[in-house]
Amino acid sequence: MNRIACTVHGRVQGVGFRYWTKRKAAALGLRGWVKNAPDGTVMLEAAGEAGLWMSLPGRCTAGLPSAP
């Protein structure tokens, strides 16, 4: 099992980003956590098979489908 940790910058608080990220990670079979940081970013850590978690950063970069 491998692990990834990252910090996401931009408009990520108050827009449902944590909930969306948690759902995407669960759909990939990943386990972990997502939380708001005091500086306005969102921090996340996910663990699972390498082939699964490698797609998570790209999905986070793409963002919510409803994002402008």
Swiss-Prot record:
It is an enzyme of class 3 (hydrolase). Residues 3-68 form the Acylphosphatase-like domain. InterPro entries: Acylphosphatase, Acylphosphatase-like_dom, Acylphosphatase-like_dom_sf, Acylphosphatase_CS. Keywords: Hydrolase. The active site is at 18, 36. It catalyses: an acyl phosphate + H2O = a carboxylate + phosphate + H(+). One of its GO terms (molecular function) is acylphosphatase activity. SUPFAM superfamilies: Acylphosphatase/BLUF domain-like (SSF54975). It comes from the Bacteria. Its EC number is 3.6.1.7. Belongs to the acylphosphatase family. PANTHER family: ACYLPHOSPHATASE. This is Acylphosphatase. It comes from Oleidesulfovibrio alaskensis (strain ATCC BAA-1058 / DSM 17464 / G20).
